[in-house]
C-alpha cells in the first residue's frame, strides 16, 4: 500500500511539474510577442518621424524661398520707411521659421538659411542707411577693398552682407578678444569683468573659451553661444536665436535663453535657463537648473529680434544621454531649490 501511495504521489508531482512547465511556454511566447510588437512599433514610429521630417523640410524650403523672394522685392523697391518696416517684419518671421526648424533641418540647410537671413538683414540695414543723406555719402566714399572682400554672393539687386559689416561699428579688439568677424568673444582671461553690447553681438556667433573667475555680460541677441574650458565663471547672456553649447566647464553660474542647450563634460554648474525646446546633458555631473531670471533694459527688444517664444520655457525638461532609465531620475542633474535661486546678477 505504501508503495502504491508513493507511486501515486510521484505521478501527481510529475503532473504538476509538467503543467508548470507548460504554463511557462505561453508566458515566454507572450513575452516574445510583446517584444516583437514593440520592435514593430519602434520601426513604424521611426518611419513616421522620417516622413514628418521630410515633409517639414519641404515646407521649410518652400516657405523660406517664398518669404525670401518677398523680402528681396521689398528691399529692391524700398523707397519708404513703411516698405522697410514690412521687410523687417517678414525677416522676423523668417528668423522664427529657422528657429522652429532647427531640430529637423540638416546642418547644411540650417547654415544656408542662417546665412541667407544674415544677408537680408544686412541689406535691410543698408537700405535704412540709404534713406539718410549723410549715411549715403559715407557709403559712396568707402574704399573698393571693403566691397571686393565679400565671399558670398548676395541676391540680385541686394548689397552683399559684407558691405553692411564694414559700414557698421565693430568692437575694438581688446586683450583676449577674438577679433571682429562673424565670431566674437573672449579667451584666455582670468579675474576679469567682460561685456559686449547689442551692436557687437547681433546675430553673431559668440565663443568664450579658457576663462577663469570671470564675469561675462552679453547684452543683446547672438546667433549662437559656445562656452568651453571655463572655471568659476558667471555668464549672463541675452536671448540666443539658436543654440548654446557648454563643454568642459566647472563651478560656473549661467543665465541663458535659447532654442536649445547642449552641455558636455561639465560639472557643478548652475544654469538659469529659458529654452523653447529642451536641454541635453552628456558626461556631466552636478548640473542644477532653474528658470531664467536675468534682465536688462532692452531685453524685450532682443527677445523679439531672436524669434524665441518668451512664453514657452522648458527649463526643467532635460535629456541625459548617459541615463536611459525612464523610471528613475538621472543623478547627474537636478532642480535648483527655490531658496537658492535668489542671485544678485549685477
Swiss-Prot record:
GO molecular function, one term: protein-folding chaperone binding
SMART domains recorded: CARP
Pfam families (UniProt xref): TBCC, TBCC_N
GO BP annotations, alphabetical order: post-chaperonin tubulin folding pathway; protein folding; tubulin complex assembly
Superkingdom of the organism of origin: Eukaryota
Residues the record lists as Phosphoserine modifications: 80, 168
Primary role: Tubulin-folding protein; involved in the final step of the tubulin folding pathway.
Subunit structure: Supercomplex made of cofactors A to E. Cofactors A and D function by capturing and stabilizing tubulin in a quasi-native conformation. Cofactor E binds to the cofactor D-tubulin complex; interaction with cofactor C then causes the release of tubulin polypeptides that are committed to the native state.
Protein's UniProt name: Tubulin-specific chaperone C
Amino acid at each position: 500500500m505504501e508503495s502504491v501511495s508513493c507511486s501515486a504521489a510521484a505521478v501527481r508531482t510529475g503532473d504538476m511539474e509538467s503543467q508548470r512547465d507548460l504554463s511557462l511556454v505561453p508566458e515566454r511566447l507572450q513575452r516574445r510577442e510583446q517584444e516583437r510588437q514593440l520592435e514593430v512599433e519602434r520601426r513604424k514610429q521611426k518611419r513616421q518621424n522620417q516622413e514628418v521630417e521630410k515633409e517639414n523640410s519641404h515646407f521649410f524650403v518652400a516657405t523660406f524661398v517664398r518669404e525670401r523672394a518677398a523680402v528681396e522685392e521689398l528691399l529692391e523697391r524700398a523707397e519708404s520707411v513703411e516698405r522697410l518696416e514690412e521687410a523687417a517684419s517678414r525677416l522676423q518671421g523668417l528668423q522664427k521659421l529657422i528657429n522652429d526648424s532647427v531640430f529637423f533641418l540638416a546642418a547644411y540647410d540650417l547654415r544656408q538659411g542662417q546665412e541667407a537671413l544674415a544677408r537680408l538683414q544686412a541689406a535691410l540695414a543698408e537700405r535704412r542707411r540709404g534713406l539718410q543723406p549723410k549715411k549715403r555719402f559715407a557709403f559712396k566714399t568707402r574704399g573698393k577693398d571693403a566691397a571686393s572682400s565679400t565671399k558670398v554672393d548676395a541676391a540680385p539687386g541686394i548689397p552683399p552682407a559684407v558691405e553692411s559689416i564694414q559700414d557698421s561699428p565693430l568692437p575694438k579688439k581688446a586683450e583676449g578678444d577674438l577679433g571682429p568677424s562673424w565670431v566674437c568673444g573672449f579667451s584666455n582671461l582670468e579675474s576679469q569683468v567682460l561685456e559686449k553690447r547689442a551692436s557687437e553681438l547681433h546675430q553673431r556667433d559668440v565663443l568664450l573659451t579658457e576663462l577663469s573667475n570671470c564675469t561675462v555680460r552679453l547684452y543683446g541677441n547672438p546667433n549662437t553661444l559656445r562656452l568651453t574650458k571655463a572655471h568659476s565663471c558667471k555668464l549672463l547672456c541675452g536671448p540666443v536665436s539658436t543654440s548654446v553649447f557648454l563643454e568642459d566647464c566647472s563651478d560656473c553660474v549661467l543665465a541663458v535663453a535659447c532654442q536649445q542647450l547642449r552641455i558636455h563634460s561639465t560639472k557643478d554648474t548652475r544654469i538659469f535657463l529659458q529654452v523653447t525646446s529642451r536641454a541635453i546633458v552628456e558626461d556631466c555631473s552636478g548640473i542644477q537648473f532653474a528658470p531664467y531670471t536675468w534682465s536688462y533694459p532692452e531685453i524685450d527688444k532682443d527677445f523679439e529680434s531672436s524669434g524665441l517664444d518668451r512664453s514657452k520655457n522648458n527649463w526643467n525638461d532635460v535629456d541625459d544621454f548617459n541615463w536611459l532609465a525612464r523610471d528613475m531620475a538621472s543623478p547627474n542633474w537636478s532642480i535648483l531649490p527655490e531658496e537658492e535661486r535668489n542671485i544678485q546678477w549685477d
